[in-house]
Amino acid sequence: MDIVVDSHTHTIASGHAYSTILENALAAKNKGLKLLCTTDHAPEMPGAPHYWHFNNQRILPRFLHEVGILRGVEANTLNVKGEIDLPLSSDQHLDWVIASFHEPVFRPATEAEHTAALINVIKSGRVDVLGHLGNPNYPFDMEQVLRCAKSHNVAIEVNNTSLTGKSRKGSDARCDQIVALGKEIGVYFSTGSDAHFCEEISKLDLAIELLEKHGVEKDKILTTSTRRFLKFLLLRGKPRIPEFDAFY
C-alpha cells in the first residue's frame, strides 16, 4: 500500500517536538510524500503555541520542498460538550483539524463521558478526524462513536506512534478493534505518523500493516491518494485549494 499523505506531524512550535516545518517538508520530499499536514498541538497542551500560530498559517507557502502543505492543528477535546481549544475564528484558516484526548488537558473519566465527548466533537462540525483513539486511558463505545463518525463524514486516524508501544502503551489491541469495526461500518481512515522529529515523517509501516490485515479498501483510506484526501476535504465543506489543482 502506497501512502502519499502524512496526516499528523509536529514542529518545534508544539513545545516537545524537535524539527522545523522546513525540515519536515524536506523529509517528506525525500520519502516520496505528495502532501504533508502540519498539525501542531493546540493551546491547552502544555508548551503549545497561542492560537495566533494557527491563524497565521495562511502565510505559509502551499509548497515547501515541492511538497504540498496542509495547514492544520491537533486540537484538544476539552470536555463532554465536545469543545476544542481554538476559537471559531481559527476554523477558516485551517485545512485539517484533528481532535484528540490528551491526559494533561482532559483527565481520563468514564466510558460514558469519553463517548459523549467524542460524539459531541463529531457533531460540532469543527473536526475532520479523530486522533489516536486507541489510547486505553480513554475507553469509549466504539460502535456508537464510529457510526456517528461515518454519518458525519469524520475520519478515524490510524496513528503509527500508538502502534509502536512507545506512547499510549496498550493502544495496539484497541486500534485493532477500531480498524476491524471501522471497516465493517465503512468509516474513512487516515494514517498519521504523529512525527515529533523529521526522521519520523512518513513512518507509517505499522498503520499500513494494520489496515492491510483487516482488508480495508483503498477508497476508504484517505491518505493513499492526494485526490482522495482533497476530495474528502471538499466533502467536509472546506474550500478548494487552487494551488493543489493538479492533485484533485
From Swiss-Prot:
Family note: Belongs to the PHP family.
Broadest EC class assigned to this enzyme: hydrolase
Ligand binding (Zn(2+) 3): E74, H102, H132
SMART domains from the UniProt entry: POLIIIAc
A GO term from the CC aspect: cytosol
GO biological process: bacterial-type flagellum-dependent swarming motility
GO-annotated molecular function: phosphatase activity; zinc ion binding
Organism annotation: Vibrio parahaemolyticus serotype O3:K6 (strain RIMD 2210633)
Cofactor: Zn(2+)
EC annotation from Swiss-Prot or TrEMBL: 3.1.3.-
Binding annotation for Zn(2+) 1: H8, H10, E74, D194
Gene3D superfamilies: Metal-dependent hydrolases (3.20.20.140)
Cofactor note: Binds 3 Zn(2+) ions per subunit.
Binding-site residues for Zn(2+) 2, renumbered to this chain: H16, H41, H196
Highest taxon of source: Bacteria
Pfam families assigned: PHP (PF02811)
Name of the protein this chain belongs to: Probable phosphatase VPA0505
InterPro entries assigned: Phosphatase_YcdX_put, PHP_dom, PHP_phosphatase, Pol/His_phosphatase_N, Pol/histidinol_Pase-like
Keywords, comma-separated and alphabetical: Hydrolase, Metal-binding, Zinc
